[in-house]
Amino acid sequence: MQNQRIRIRLKAFDYKLIDASTAEIVETAKRTGAQVRGPIPLPTRKERFTVLISPHVNKKARDQYEIRTHKRLIDIVEPTDKTVDALMRLDLAAGVDVQISLG
């Protein structure tokens, strides 16, 4: 796997889960002898929703909600076969979305 790079993008609503997952991925990759760049924090996406509380009148009565999507990027440079096997066997938290691309 010479001159290859594995790029891992992580997304989660809870920053504690995503930080724990990135630490686990980085530790696994370093243990198998690969060079790791990151984790790089990407911009957090904030979605805001405004909902009317009253079912009929009272336009001024509203609730506001916010969902934050935290993102991290990890580059694994020159991965070994051990690195790929270890990453495939890795069990991450259920609330973390993982996208892996080879380049």
Swiss-Prot record:
It comes from the Bacteria. This is Small ribosomal subunit protein uS10. One of its GO terms (molecular function) is structural constituent of ribosome. It holds the Pfam family Ribosomal_S10. Part of the 30S ribosomal subunit. Coiled coil: none annotated. Involved in the binding of tRNA to the ribosomes. NCBIfam families: PRK00596.1 (NF001861), rpsJ_bact (TIGR01049). GO terms for cellular component: ribonucleoprotein complex; ribosome. Belongs to the universal ribosomal protein uS10 family. Keywords: Ribonucleoprotein, Ribosomal protein. GO terms for biological process: translation.
